[in-house]
């Protein structure tokens, strides 16, 4: 994998690590982030090879874009996910994680990555905690890695 720079950018008072080069974003998503999504599928007893989103990853072109938070849509299947066996409740865990991240951003200026959005419908596919936190902080725009077919 080629090395790409990850400069720091500030937007609306929030600091981001960003990859600006589309090839770098592609590599990052198709290696590092893909691993996370495959692990998520496995933990939910789904076959990652059957996941429609994962099947399109390598076909997507990626870009770094600034997007109004209000334009980003949430996937109800993700937001409402509950695993009755383990007791895991996505919304409850998200609320806890978002509070921690909000504190980190407000008090310590921690650096975050852009959220990942599917361009054809502006569906958020990764970064629910970052999105929720930014929305709670009243941040109107965010950096996104935008994927399009």
Q: What does each model-found stretch correspond to?
A:
Residues 5, 9-18, 27, 110-149:
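A short, basic-hydrophobic beta/loop patch
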Residues 1-71, 81-92:
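An acidic, glycine-rich, mixed-charge low-complexity segment common to nucleic-acid enzymes
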Residues 2, 64, 72-125, 132:
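Short alpha-helix boundary/capping and kink motifs at helix termini
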């Amino acid at each position: 994998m080629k090395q790409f720079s990850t400069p720091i950018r500030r937007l609306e008072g929030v600091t981001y690590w960003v990859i600006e080069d589309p090839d770098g974003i592609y590599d990052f998503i198709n290696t590092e982030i893909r691993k996370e999504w495959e692990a998520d599928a496995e933990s939910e007893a789904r076959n990652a090879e059957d996941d429609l989103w994962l099947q399109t990853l390598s076909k997507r072109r990626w870009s770094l874009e600034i997007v109004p938070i209000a334009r980003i849509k949430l996937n109800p299947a993700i937001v409402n996910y509950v695993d009755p066996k383990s007791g895991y409740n996505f919304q409850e865990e998200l609320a806890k994680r978002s509070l921690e991240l909000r504190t980190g951003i407000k008090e310590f200026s921690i650096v975050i990555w852009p959220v990942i959005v599917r361009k054809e419908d502006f569906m958020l596919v990764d970064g629910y905690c970052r999105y929720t936190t930014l929305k709670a902080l009243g941040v109107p725009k965010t950096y996104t890695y935008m994927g399009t077919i």
